[in-house]
Amino acid sequence: RSVKLLSEEENVKNKIWQQTRLHEYLNEMPVSQILIEGIEADDIIAQICNEMYVGDYEKVIVSSDKDFIQRCDNSTVLYRPIQKKVLNKNTVIDEYKISPNWFALARAITGDKSDNLAGVGGVGLKTIARRFPFFSDPHRASCFYQLYEHCRENIDGPKVYKTVLENKDLVESNYKLMQLYAPSMSPQNKSII
């Protein structure tokens, strides 16, 4: 029967059945699974990248979610299957003119439609790359102070600087939700990983 013809209740049951089957299949393969109730997969993946035991092993994140771009570094790459692209720290800078260590802040400014997070109106990644050139510096850690200071210094310039300053609360709220550098997770949940 076509999934399109299922009732809402049947659709939910079908999804549960699919997830159960996938879990069973993966149990038969050399694949590790980590499921923690109440914790999103992206936070678990980010925490694994932070763990000492994975050290400098090359890590490959497979996802089309732009949130993972911020995790690209010398030992972590992102494979985006829908786009058929592999991103690393250098390709992110080449493509977006924004370093992965600034990417969460850039996306906090632009918002994320897929996560239903509004951004600062009229500001996209290209505008950020053009108006905030220090976002491309892989040796500079991102911080709100540098962003706001740059905006104050250029307040009489293009409108973007004033608009970002007027939306500081939105940017900071978005950042807390979007950043995967230090995922919020209890020590008990971290110990599971």
What is the predicted function of each stretch?
Residues 1:
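Non-catalytic, usually N-terminal nucleic-acid engagement modules in DNA/RNA processing proteins
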Residues 5-190:
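Extended two-metal-dependent nuclease catalytic cores across DNA- and RNA-processing enzymes
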